[in-house]
Every structure is written in C-alpha cells, then in structure tokens.
Regions:
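Hydrophobic residues in well-ordered beta-strands that form the structural core
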Residues: 47, 110-112, 150, 189, ...
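A structural motif
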Residues: 77, 146, 239, 272-273
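Acidic/histidine-rich catalytic cores of soluble enzymes
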Residues: 79-80, 170-266
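Conserved residues at the C-terminal ends of beta-strands
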Residues: 83, 152, 245, 278-279
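A short helix->loop->beta-strand "cap" motif at the edges of active sites that frequently abuts
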Residues: 108, 185, 270-274
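Active-site groove signature of glycoside hydrolases
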Residues: 141-160, 183-192
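Active-site clefts of carbohydrate-active enzymes
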Residues: 246-251, 275-284
C-alpha cells in the first residue's frame, strides 16, 4: 500500500515558515517537516494503565483493566491509555469490544495503547515474532478504536553495531506502517533508551520515515541530557502522543520533580494537539499520588 508523504502535505507550509535564529542543533532537528499544526494547542487528559502496574501485575491482580477504567472515570478524565501488558494473553475481540463499550459508557476515549517490541533484531524467527506482535496490536487497537500505538525501536545487542540496528529498526517500522494505515492506526515511536536515548538518535529514525500515520511518542521523563526540557522542545513538533512523567533526571544527577508547567509550555509552544497521558512511575503509591498529579495537570492544560 502506498502511503502519501507527509512532506507532500506540508511542503507549501514548510516553505512559508521563516527560520529563526536558533542553535545549529535545533535547525538540524527541524530539517524534516514537523506535523503541520497552526492552530492553538488543544490538550486533553488521559492516564496510562502502566501507572497502576503494581496492582495490575500483582499475583493475583488487585486491579483489572475494567477497574482501571472505573478509576479514570472517577477522576473525570477524557481518556485512558490501555497498556498492552495488562490484557489477557491471546486476548480476543470480544474482550476488546466489551472494554471499549465499558469506557464509552463512562464517557472515556481509549486514547491509545502500547506494545513492547524490539525492531533492532536481525532477520530470523525472533524478529518475525516482533513484527507479528506489532501487527497483532494494530488489530487490537482497531478493535478498541484506539488511534495510536506507542512502539519502541529497540536496543543494540551485545556485539552488534548501532548503525545496523538503526537500519533494521527503520525497516521494521516501515514494514508495519502500511498495515497500520489500513486499520486507521498511527504508530508513535517513543524516546525509550537504546537507539532512541537522545534527541539526535531519535531524529535519525524519524528523519528516515515519511508517513502521515507515524510520529513521536514523547515521553517527558526519558531524556537525560543537561537540559531535558530543551530536548523535549526539539521533539515536540513531531509528537502524536505525549506521556508525562512526574520526575526527570539530568545528566550526572539524580531524579528531581518535573516542572510540569514547563512541560506543558513546551507542548503549547509546539502547538501540540492531542492527549497528555500521565504515566506515573515515582515511588509513592499510585492510589495517592496519581489524583494529585492529575489535578495539577488539569489546571495546567485547562
């Protein structure tokens, strides 16, 4: 299936944008066309099921996805992000449809889902499994009416070369995109360590992939340079989904509380439109911390 080029859509708009006086690194980052957003930023609030991983993963589970959706509804959210890890093994369409109906009845969108793939693997059965996993979750996302799936690029295996791993990751994403387009699903590549640990590494992949149903899943806690907020600003124009962490860690320093107001300002400056998904990972129990952080985010995006 031929995917129309985002560059085709944005060529005229990109040509009309004046280049401000910005650092060389930022100019290089903007060499590929960002998503063409000119309207004021429009932000909606969602919560990732991963925030409750301790309850969803416990043996036996202290929460299931239906109960997670109930919690999100009690919080007055716009949507929920249903992480793939917490679905039943070999989940069937009937379960997905019941979960979608449950969220709909409570006034919630399913803002997205996510899959833990590794496209850096060389050709062979292990790589085929990863490609099939993403394809399965494209199907599942379509059943859920989830518009976006968070995907990973992967990691460089011991003895492998980063350039080769990057090439394989690019090929894996390109191979998956046409099927995702057929199902009406966008693939969002996260900055998640490995070959996407830095803005430059992530942009190397993004620059190589030109499709309207592809973008960045911007995780605000996953850049660890000297100025993570500046790094986020470089990638925000390419974001199709945003996962907000309540902590950041700078190069050579430990964790510190994230400046959520600054994070939201970065998104607004980029005219980001879409879901802001709280993905809580800090030490305080989610039951007590998540409501407080949602209240803060709601006040910032309203």
């Amino acid at each position: 299936m031929h995917l129309p080029s985002r560059r085709t859509f944005l060529k005229a708009a990109a040509a009309a944008v004046a280049v401000p006086s910005i650092p060389i690194s930022a100019r290089s980052a903007r060499a590929i066309p960002p998503i063409g957003r000119t309207r004021p930023s429009h932000l909606k609030l969602s919560l990732a099921a991963y925030s409750f991983r301790d309850e969803l993963d416990s043996k036996p589970p202290r929460m299931d996805l239906f109960e997670f959706v109930n919690f999100a509804a009690d919080m007055g959210l716009d949507g929920v992000e249903l992480t793939s890890y917490y679905f039943p093994a070999d989940v069937k369409p009937d379960y997905l449809h019941r979960l979608k109906q449950h969220a709909f009845n409570l006034g919630l969108d399913i803002s997205g889902t996510s899959v833990g793939n590794n496209f850096c693997l060389p050709a062979g059965p292990a790589r085929d499994i990863q490609l099939a996993l993403v394809r399965t979750w494209i199907d599942n996302a379509a059943h859920l009416d989830a518009p976006v799936i968070r995907i990973f690029a992967g990691n460089v295996a011991k003895g492998d070369e980063e350039a080769k791993a990057v090439a394989r990751a690019i090929e894996g994403i390109k191979e998956s995109l046409p099927y995702a387009a057929e199902k009406g699903v966008t693939l969002a590549l996260e900055n998640h360590g490995g070959i996407t640990a830095s803005p430059g590494q992530l942009l190397k992949l993004v620059k190589a992939i030109d499709a309207p149903n592809f973008g960045v899943n911007l995780d605000t806690g996953n850049f660890h340079g000297e100025d993570p907020y500046a790094d986020l600003a470089l990638l925000a124009p390419y974001a199709v989904n945003v996962q907000v962490k309540t902590e950041i860690s700078r190069k050579g320093k430990g964790k510190e509380e994230a400046d959520l107001a600054r994070v939201v300002a970065v998104l607004r400056d980029a005219h980001y439109a879409g879901y802001v998904v709280l993905e809580y990972e800090a030490e305080e129990t989610a039951r007590t911390a998540v409501p407080r952080h949602l209240k803060t985010l709601r006040s910032l995006i309203s």
